[in-house]
């Protein structure tokens, strides 16, 4: 505890640097990837066919998910995966994940496979739920 109190300035710099790096890394993709809130996601889904890819762990996915979403692992993103191969390159894709850092690598992998119309649900499934939007679970 003494180390922390003696180096609080160092810890603040570390935290601020991490936040800036996170913002630059994820925010830097904003010209290519649209970050949308829950209502924007509803508009996206209702306006044209949208593939919803959920990269949370299976137990979280089983508890609450958006209807018709597909649960994948980051490792599933490759040109041989049937779930990925079925997605046409011009389809809109809505991504859901728990981590911005995980999303960064997922987006890069999808872009490497020539998917361009990528959207991210800001706040993940929690923002969807807090907007009182419907979810499915294994008991429904």
Predicted features and spans:
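Active-site flanking residues adjacent to catalytic metal/cofactor-binding acidic residues
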Residues: 53
């Amino acid at each position: 505890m003494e180390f922390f109190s003696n180096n609080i300035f160092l810890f603040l710099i570390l935290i601020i640097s991490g936040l800036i790096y996170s913002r630059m890394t994820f925010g830097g993709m904003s010209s290519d990837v649209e970050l949308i809130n829950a209502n924007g996601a509803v508009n996206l889904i209702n306006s044209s066919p949208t593939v919803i890819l959920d990269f949370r762990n299976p137990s979280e996915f089983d508890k609450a998910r958006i209807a018709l979403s597909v649960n994948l692992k980051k490792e599933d993103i490759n040109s041989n995966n049937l779930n990925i191969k079925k997605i046409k390159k011009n389809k809109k894709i809505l991504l859901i994940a728990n981590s911005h850092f995980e999303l960064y690598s997922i987006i890069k992998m999808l872009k490497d496979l020539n998917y361009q119309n990528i959207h991210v649900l800001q706040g993940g499934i929690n923002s969807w739920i807090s907007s009182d939007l419907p979810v499915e679970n294994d008991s429904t």
